[in-house]
Amino acid sequence: MRTKKELPECPVATTVELVGSKWKLLILRNLRIRPWRFNELQRSLSGISRKVLTDSLRSMEADGIIIRTVYQEVPPRVEYSLSPLGKLMEPVILAMEQWGITYKQIKER
């Protein structure tokens, strides 16, 4: 997890730095519903490369936003879910969803 000194002073800039990429926001959108496996996430995010998905998941795990759970099974199973800190993003994602709906309705008039 990054230290306070490594993050921008502005809280909005901090949020953008941690989760502001297109893919991270869409990953969070999915993870707010349920835990997902890597291949499920990749299939649900049209256009994302394995490298970008891997980098995004590792970054959010390192920042304490998501949890990577490895199950001791054969074959191995790994799931990604929101951490308690990541769950605090749910109202933000829902607000973005509502804003997107409203924007589309206005543009359709």
Segments (PLM) and residue ranges:
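Alpha-helical residues within the helix-turn-helix
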Residues: 43, 61-62
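Basic amphipathic alpha-helical segments that dock to polyanions
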Residues: 53, 57-60
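Basic, amphipathic "hinge/linker" alpha-helix immediately C-terminal to the N-terminal HTH DNA-binding motif
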Residues: 72-95
